[in-house]
Amino acid sequence: MNMRRVFGGVSTDLFPSRSMYRPLQSGGNLVMLFKGCRRFVRTTCRVSIPGGSLGNESKAPPRFLRDRKIVPDADPPNMEDIHKLYRLFEQSSRLTILTGAGVSTECGIPDYRSPNGAYSSGFKPITHQEFTRSSRARRRYWARSYAGWRRFTAAQPGPAHTALASLEKAGRINFMITQNVDRLHHRAGSDPLELHGTVYTVMCLECGFSFPRDLFQDQLKAINPKWAEAIESIDHGDPGSEKSFGMKQRPDGDIEIDEKFWEEGFHIPVCEKCKGVLKPDVIFFGDNIPKERATQAMEVAKQSDAFLVLGSSLMTMSAFRLCRAAHEAGAMTAIVNIGETRADDIVPLKINARVGEILHRVLDVGSLSVPAL
């Protein structure tokens, strides 16, 4: 079959070997049978059109990054809450911001704990112990992460990221801490302390050598060429869609993918310095935040005169401790989050709203001397 005709001329030579790929048409979808390892694996993908995921990706973000199913439902913020939050910015001189997944759901990156989050479908993230002890678990993690990387990195900073960057430039934020690993704050112009690390760096568990994730992505592709070519040809579908063919994006960038893709023949690079195990530079569940990083975050929290939590349920103790420490030290404390948080009983101001929406409303209230967004 002519693959140029199937894809409407969007891409050429995607499948150079007819002996390896056998495409079929089925119900408007493209069905590919490709040799994953030693047997054929059947998968289904939607045919992309110009301007879609195989088109010019420098244009507006794809629809899956604007899907409101990712963002939990919330009523528009009322004026009373907007003014209360405005006064916190106006009255503080040492304001610390702590951000969580709720600032990135507006960019199409799902969270874990909201009604639309990863946990709602029964997903359990990999633990540090599982990753370090099981080579099979590592193959599964890296295969899923490789497949989701292009989609994850296509996300753009959202309204919360841009508003916070402007507030920083205006001197209204003294320090920012984030639980997120997606680096969207950096792309908006901020430089937060990454409490849980970042997926943009890969590190060796043996010698500590680290290098950019993009380089590791290239290494994975080089040693798994047939697998990589097949997986990159698949359009993963929209988040939450019934047509996503079992490939739903996770908060850390990996996607749900059938084990047939990785259980045999998928190889993982080792550290070029010591041949050790390579891991994303993130804090998996069951792992500890490096002492120096945790100490810095705690010192900042205790020295703040205001502490604002944005888009976090504070269910991880590392984040909850910071909020509690700031509150006990006498700081004005507030939370903007959709749904309950661990600190609801100790924080005097809790606002149930989308972070990006209320921050932009706050900037419209009065003069915070903030640069135009």
From Swiss-Prot:
Q: Which InterPro entries match?
A: DHS-like_NAD/FAD-binding_dom, NAD-dep_sirtuin_deacylases, Sirtuin, Sirtuin_cat_small_dom_sf, Sirtuin_class_II, Ssirtuin_cat_dom
**Can you provide one Gene Ontology molecular function annotated for this UniProt record?**
NAD-dependent protein lysine deacetylase activity
Explain what induces or represses this protein's expression: Repressed by pathogen infection.
The active site consists of 196
Q: Name one Pfam family in it.
A: SIR2
Tell me the cofactor note.
Binds 1 zinc ion per subunit.
Q: Which cofactor does it need?
A: Zn(2+)
Lineage, top-rank taxon, reads Eukaryota
Recorded catalytic reaction(s): these are:
N(6)-acetyl-L-lysyl-[protein] + NAD(+) + H2O = 2''-O-acetyl-ADP-D-ribose + nicotinamide + L-lysyl-[protein]
Q: Which residues bind NAD(+)?
A: 100-120, 179-182, 311-313, 337-339, 355
State the GO CC annotations: mitochondrial matrix; nucleus
User: What residue ranges carry the coiled-coil annotation?
Assistant: none
Q: Where does Zn(2+) bind?
A: 204, 207, 271, 274
Signal sequence segment: none
Q: How does it assemble?
A: Binds to the promoter region of genes influenced by ethylene. Interacts with ENAP1; this interaction is enhanced in the presence of ethylene.
Sum up the protein's function in the record's words.
NAD-dependent protein deacylase. Catalyzes the NAD-dependent hydrolysis of acyl groups from lysine residues. Involved in responses to ethylene leading to the transcriptional repression of some ethylene-responsive genes via the regulation of histone acetylation H3K9Ac. Negatively regulates plant basal defense against plant pathogens, possibly by suppressing salicylic acid biosynthesis.
What is this protein's name? NAD-dependent protein deacylase SRT2
